[in-house]
């Protein structure tokens, strides 16, 4: 990150997360065990808040600045704009000179320990009101957040060998930041280019396969095993989403005993498909069961047709009975007749009232249903041009209408230098990542996380009998997906309404 970008002044968003004004004070609400991120208004006397991490009866605070980064207003004209997006830890400053070179305070992190008690804590003009409810550790959240990780983007950016010791060291702060937001699925690749080459960096297989001269197959799970263990150590999981048995274009590859790369088009239902995947599924199942990972593993697919999914699902159950299937799709689950999709993710732009009626029956069967956005819709989303409250909406909205969580296709598929320009190709800037290379969160990720926390609170309050279905129905009616897609919602009012609900 250059000093130029650090010192450029851009417009600061003066919204507040989980906070409210009270005279010349600003008040935040938090549950016991919660970490709150709130914006500091421009007119707040932030000089009164200590820069270094300060503790008061089980509550600590830390201040962050927001450093601006460039993005293309129009990918064709390349006119650049600035947005304050990168969280910068101000407690790491060494002296006054360092401080002058840092952005001003913009975000306050409030950490309430699990041993804290109900009451009010004061930090200068900031008051933190602790509510007598407990938010469990992030590993115990039930909300299913799935943000696809990209190891090869880290390898390229830091110029380290994929899956070397140096690579894992570079990945760790990014993966831990994602885990802090509640990411529950580790993105694993079973082949090269599961989605073609749509990012700056290509995905490759984590399982090397060799076809022997006698026609048998050999599989090397070394990288797969190391990566799963690494991801879980960082806090991501326990689920393992394996992409995919149905790549875009159907092309798969392997090596022969001479090390030559061979390719074939393996369309579901064909002999080529069965030859390529049959022995693998049997051996992969054996390996997963030996590791104790089978129950948490999904064969995952992305926007595949019902015809393809039907053939793949039947083949999976033939070769690996009990293997789960995950699917990000733009159709209702009922269109996949006779197919058990254990984790179905619905595109927001194709959401319907009829689809919402399927959520409760799926949950009763033990199946997950989540919501996703990608390069569309234009609103709400998590682009650089998106309002911060859009990210909060995407995190919290699933909880008020019966979804189990949220998915986005790119957590860290960075462009060449995301600290200079977040634009890549024809994608809208910010579409390809939410966390920066050194593990810094974007403000878009922070707002999404706060929405996830609100959703988790809604779940806990419902289970405790503190919320009834009617209240959520009213919220869904007032802040529903149709008005959101039509840009008719005041997202700030939605955020305020949700925070009033969960912190009452």
Where are these regions (language model features)?
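Sec-dependent N-terminal signal peptides
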Residues: 3-15
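Beta-sheet-dominated interaction scaffolds and their linkers
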Residues: 20-42
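Surface-exposed binding patches on compact interaction domains or structured appendages
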Residues: 22, 43-99
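Short, solvent-exposed loop/turn segments enriched in Ser/Thr/Gly
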Residues: 33-39, 102-111
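Aromatic-lined carbohydrate-binding surfaces of glycoside hydrolases
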Residues: 50, 92, 97-101, 108-118, ...
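Short, glycine/acidic-rich beta->alpha junctions
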Residues: 104, 169-170, 222-223, 307-308, ...
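Catalytic domains of carbohydrate-active enzymes that cleave complex glycans
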Residues: 251-254, 265-269, 273, 277-331, ...
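Catalytic-core region of carbohydrate-active enzymes that cleave or remodel glycosidic bonds
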Residues: 343-427
């Amino acid at each position: 990150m250059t000093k130029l970008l650090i010192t450029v002044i851009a417009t600061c968003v003066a919204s507040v997360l989980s906070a409210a004004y009270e005279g010349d004070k600003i008040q935040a609400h938090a549950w016991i065990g919660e970490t709150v991120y709130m914006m500091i208004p421009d007119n707040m006397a932030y000089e009164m808040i200590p820069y270094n991490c300060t503790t008061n009866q089980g509550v600590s605070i830390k201040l962050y600045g927001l450093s601006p980064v460039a993005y293309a207003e129009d990918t064709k004209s390349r006119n650049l704009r600035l947005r304050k997006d990168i969280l910068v830890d101000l407690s790491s400053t060494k002296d006054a000179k360092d401080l002058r070179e840092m952005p001003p305070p913009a975000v306050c992190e409030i950490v309430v320990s699990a041993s804290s008690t109900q009451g009010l804590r004061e930090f200068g003009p900031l008051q933190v009101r602790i509510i007598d409810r407990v938010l469990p550790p992030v590993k115990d959240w039930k909300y299913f957040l799935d943000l696809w990780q990209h190891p090869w983007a880290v390898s390229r950016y830091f110029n380290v060998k994929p899956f070397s010791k140096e690579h894992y060291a570079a990945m760790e702060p990014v993966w831990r930041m994602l885990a802090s937001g509640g990411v529950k699925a580790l993105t694993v690749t079973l082949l090269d280019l599961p989605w073609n080459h749509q990012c700056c960096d290509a995905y490759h297989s984590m399982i090397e396969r060799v076809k022997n001269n006698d026609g048998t197959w050999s599989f090397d799970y070394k990288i797969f095993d190391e990566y799963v263990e690494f991801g879980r150590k960082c806090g991501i999981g326990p689920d393992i989403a394996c992409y995919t048995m149905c790549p875009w274009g159907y092309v798969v590859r392997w090596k022969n005993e001479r090390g030559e790369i061979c390719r074939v088009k393996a369309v579901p239902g064909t002999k080529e498909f069965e030859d390529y995947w049959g022995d693998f599924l049997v051996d992969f199942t054996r390996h997963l069961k030996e590791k104790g990972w089978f129950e948490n593993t999904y064969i995952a697919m992305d926007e595949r047709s019902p015809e393809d999914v039907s053939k793949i699902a039947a083949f999976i159950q033939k070769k690996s009975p009990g293997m789960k299937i995950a699917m990000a799709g733009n159709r209702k689950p009922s269109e996949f007749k006779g197919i058990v999709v254990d984790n179905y993710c619905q595109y927001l732009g194709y959401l319907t009232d009829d689809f919402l009626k399927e959520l409760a029956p799926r949950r009763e069967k033990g199946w997950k249903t989540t919501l996703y956005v990608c390069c569309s819709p234009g609103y709400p989303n998590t682009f650089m041009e998106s309002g911060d409250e859009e990210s909060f909406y995407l995190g919290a909205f699933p909880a008020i209408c019966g979804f189990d969580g949220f998915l986005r296709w790119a957590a860290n598929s960075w462009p060449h230098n995301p600290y200079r320009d977040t634009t890549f190709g024809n994608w809208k800037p910010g579409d390809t990542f939410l966390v920066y290379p050194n593990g810094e969160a974007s403000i878009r990720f922070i707002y999404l996380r706060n929405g996830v926390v609100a959703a988790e609170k809604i779940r806990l309050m419902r289970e405790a009998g503190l919320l009834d279905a009617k209240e959520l129905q009213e919220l869904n009616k007032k802040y529903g997906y149709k008005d959101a897609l039509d840009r008719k919602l005041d997202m700030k009012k939605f955020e305020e309404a949700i925070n009033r609900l969960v912190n009452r």
